[in-house]
């Protein structure tokens, strides 16, 4: 079951076998000397060219690979370690630990190419997944086993929200998380590791990195590596897992690079013709079964802010909720900078979340929308020109806006305020009181960066005492 390399075109390598034809997605291995060190390279079969020749995609840099070099067929697809042993470690696409903390002694290895759970095993019940973040739980609640898109530009706090969610899941649901860094910056991956170490959530999370500098094969398949680890926790251990993908756009982007390298005819905007199938194959595996669930949060980069671009458009079809981060909110110093009017959720339905929650959420959105409409008048004529009713709307809206902020556990290091987890009941109760005017006489500053309403009242008393 050995073959010889006959052609090397960057990350695409053709291999000839004499009496064996490897299957599509089968892993092949080759070892060679490069710069005085022995290197191991894993290739994944992408196409069968006939005459026992296969075209493969390299899972690492192919420098030093020469024609005539021997390649061994493994008879199986890429296998990665799964189970509790993977927690607290960093892996590359082929499941090797890259954090210099020794090999991973995993008892089980699974293939990264798996079928989605069959229909009869999928769970159909809709449950709200409580995150402890007020603005998310109130206005765009996540569903257990659902998919959330996290949209935002650079530096508005996508990664901080991701870390807070990992922290809250580890704390409240004592669950595990898997983080797949798909084609993002090495520096960010490094920062994330050390920040998690500092905020003590590292032992509850497995990290899989395929950074920007990797060849397209590694950047594409890393999403499957992370997902496989999450599936083990769901299927074999019956857990509710959180799966983070940062960034799902890079999954589509690397797929398009691979497709071009394999000589396939491109479709719209130069993307691969199989874009929606590839996206579907990944997303279909992220689901709830009768045993456990995978709730996924996917950061989505939108190229040139064009939501109709085929890559983000192919993600939209799969999402249950969107959390949109807005720079203008971050500039006001309100964190998390979630846009309360732009974020949506399939769960915001009175039949799922109940009448009370639904009415409070819609009430909050109405007041904020009215405030937004009045902002032009305020900017030109000032507050004094508004009617009494409008003044009240503005006052309440400003309090609501402030109350949508909250201190995070993972940001404690640089804000100095201890993080809070706010239960859904407390969240609904607080905003209901604000809408009913219970807190009209309180100081606006009392609502900024607090958890529940009791904290705001205590803060207000402190301000008044001064």
UniProtKB/Swiss-Prot annotation:
Is Isomerase there in the keyword field?
Answer: no
Question: Mostly located where?
Answer: membrane
Gene Ontology CC annotations of this record: plasma membrane; proton-transporting ATP synthase complex
Key words, A-Z: ATP synthesis, ATP-binding, Cell inner membrane, Cell membrane, CF(1), Hydrogen ion transport, Ion transport, Membrane, Nucleotide-binding, Translocase, Transport
Going by the entry's taxonomy, the superkingdom of the source organism is recorded as Bacteria
Parts of the chain that traverse the membrane: none
Quaternary state and partners of this protein? F-type ATPases have 2 components, CF(1) - the catalytic core - and CF(0) - the membrane proton channel. CF(1) has five subunits: alpha(3), beta(3), gamma(1), delta(1), epsilon(1). CF(0) has three main subunits: a(1), b(2) and c(9-12). The alpha and beta chains form an alternating ring which encloses part of the gamma chain. CF(1) is attached to CF(0) by a central stalk formed by the gamma and epsilon chains, while a peripheral stalk is formed by the delta and b chains.
Q: Which family does it belong to?
A: Belongs to the ATPase alpha/beta chains family.
Q: What is this protein called?
A: ATP synthase subunit beta
Encoding gene per record: atpD
């Amino acid at each position: 079951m050995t073959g010889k390399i006959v052609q090397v075109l960057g990350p695409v390598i053709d291999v000839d076998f004499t009496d064996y034809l490897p299957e599509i997605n089968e892993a092949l291995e080759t070892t060679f000397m490069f710069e005085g060190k022995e290197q191991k390279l894993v290739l994944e079969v992408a196409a069968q060219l006939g005459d026992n020749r296969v075209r493969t995609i390299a899972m690492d840099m192919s420098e030093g690979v020469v024609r005539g070099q021997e390649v061994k067929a493994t008879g199986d697809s890429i296998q990665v370690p799964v189970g509790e042993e993977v927690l607290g470690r960093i892996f590359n696409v082929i499941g090797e630990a890259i954090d210099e903390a020794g090999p991973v002694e995993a008892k089980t290895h699974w293939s990264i190419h798996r079928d989605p759970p069959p229909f009869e095993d999928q769970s159909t019940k809709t449950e709200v997944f409580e995150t402890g973040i007020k603005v998310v739980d109130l206005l765009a609640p996540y569903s257990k086993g659902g998919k959330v898109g996290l949209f935002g530009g650079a530096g508005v706090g996508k990664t901080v929200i991701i870390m807070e969610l990992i922290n809250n899941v580890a704390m409240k649901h004592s669950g595990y998380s898997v983080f797949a860094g798909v084609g993002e910056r090495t520096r960010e991956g490094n920062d994330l590791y050390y920040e998690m170490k500092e905020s003590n959530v590292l032992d509850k999370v497995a990290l899989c990195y395929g950074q920007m500098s990797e060849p397209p094969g590694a950047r594409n398949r890393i999403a499957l590596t992370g997902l496989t680890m999450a599936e083990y926790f769901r299927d074999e251990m019956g857990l509710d897992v959180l799966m983070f993908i940062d960034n799902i756009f890079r999954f589509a982007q690397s797929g398009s690079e691979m497709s071009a390298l394999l000589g396939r005819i491109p479709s719209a905007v130069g993307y691969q013709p199989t874009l929606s199938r590839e996206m579907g194959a990944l997303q279909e595996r992220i689901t709830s079964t009768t045993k456990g669930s995978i709730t996924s949060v996917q950061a989505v980069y939108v190229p040139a802010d064009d939501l109709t671009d085929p890559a983000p458009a192919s993600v939209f079809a799969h999402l249950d909720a969107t959390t949109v981060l807005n720079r203008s909110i971050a500039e006001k110093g309100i964190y998390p900078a979630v846009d309360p009017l732009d974020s949506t959720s399939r769960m915001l339905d009175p039949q799922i979340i109940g009448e009370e929650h639904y009415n409070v959420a819609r009430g909050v959105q109405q007041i904020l929308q009215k405030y937004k409409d009045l902002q032009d008048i305020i900017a030109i004529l000032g507050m004094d020109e508004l009617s009494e009713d409008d003044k009240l709307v503005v006052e309440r809206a400003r309090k609501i806006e402030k109350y949508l902020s909250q201190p995070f556990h993972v940001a404690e290091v640089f804000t100095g305020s201890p993080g809070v987890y706010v239960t859904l009941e407390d969240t609904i109760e607080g905003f209901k009181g604000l809408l009913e005017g219970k807190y009209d006489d309180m100081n606006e500053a009392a609502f900024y960066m607090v958890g529940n309403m009791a904290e705001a009242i205590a803060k207000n008393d402190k301000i008044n005492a001064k």
